[in-house]
Amino acid sequence: MLLDHARAKCDGNHGGGPQGDERVSISTRQRGAPLDLIVAEAMILANSTWGGWLAEHGVPGIYRSQASMLPGVKVRMGTKPAPHAGMGVAQYAWSTSPLRRYVDLVNQWQIIACARHGRTAALAAPFKPKDAMLFSIVSSFDAAYSAYGDFQHGIERYWTIQYLAQQQITELDAVEMKDGLVRADNL
């Protein structure tokens, strides 16, 4: 079962605190609404454009890249622009959510240097090419992002197991998507 942004909620507490007899229900978040698509495309455009602007000015940023869409080719982070095959862009620098991600804030500092200093931005930007602190930020973010993904996976697994136990489901028909990942046919 794929639980992409699955929602787990407890029914039966009628707005009060947990009583211990709540029932778990699981549903998937519906995606693909026109507004979701507009926002996603606007973010891709902004992050790609700003990443290109950093590169044009010789200012390092924190980029996400993916060399190919072949199975097993992962997204990587680095300080130099590189294509992101999954998004179909020449470069992609997270920059649009500085309140959610420190990486975006760092990139915005670099973008502000470009806006204020133009051709001399590389001299004025907070982080210079091959800056050890910038590499440290990338490394720290990679570790935190990986830990977050593992934690999210654990939460989804926990609530799925709770649901299966409450429903007394002991067998499922499923399709193997790839090594160790299956999707339930009728859950």
What residue ranges belong to the model's regions?
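Electropositive polyanion-binding surfaces
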Residues: 1-187
